[in-house]
Amino acid sequence: MSTIEERVKKIIVEQLGVKEDEVVNSASFVDDLGADSLDTVELVMALEEEFDTEIPDEEAEKITTVQAAIDYIEAANK
């Protein structure tokens, strides 16, 4: 079974069409990975589906980096 971090990064690669080595924990979806607002919405939806969770809009707005996504999912899965 993959770790949460590995699964989150795999989703980011698939959703944003970026190279795996670009998806470092400090990377910003918009500034570093070239995502636009639609990309980030689709990314949140993919995370919700993969981890069978619901991310409220006010929380989704705070998920702007790879690490923020990992942290949110880890907290939601405790």
From Swiss-Prot:
A biological process from GO: lipid A biosynthetic process
PROSITE patterns in UniProt: CARRIER, PHOSPHOPANTETHEINE
Listed InterPro entries: ACP, ACP-like_sf, PP-bd_ACP, Ppantetheine_attach_site
Domain of life: Bacteria
Modification after translation: 4'-phosphopantetheine is transferred from CoA to a specific serine of apo-ACP by AcpS. This modification is essential for activity because fatty acids are bound in thioester linkage to the sulfhydryl of the prosthetic group.
Pathway: Lipid metabolism; fatty acid biosynthesis
Lipid biosynthesis found in the keyword field: yes
Membrane-crossing residue ranges in chain numbering: none
Pfam name, any one: PP-binding
GO molecular function: acyl binding; acyl carrier activity
Localization terms from the record: Cytoplasm
Gene3D superfamilies noted in UniProt: ACP-like (1.10.1200.10)
Modified residues (O-(pantetheine 4'-phosphoryl)serine): 37
This protein's UniProt keywords: Cytoplasm, Fatty acid biosynthesis, Fatty acid metabolism, Lipid biosynthesis, Lipid metabolism, Phosphopantetheine, Phosphoprotein
Annotated signal sequence range: none
Disulfide links within the chain: none
Function: Carrier of the growing fatty acid chain in fatty acid biosynthesis.
Family: Belongs to the acyl carrier protein (ACP) family.
The protein's name: Acyl carrier protein
Lineage of the organism: Bacteria, Pseudomonadati, Pseudomonadota, Gammaproteobacteria, Enterobacterales
GN (gene name): acpP
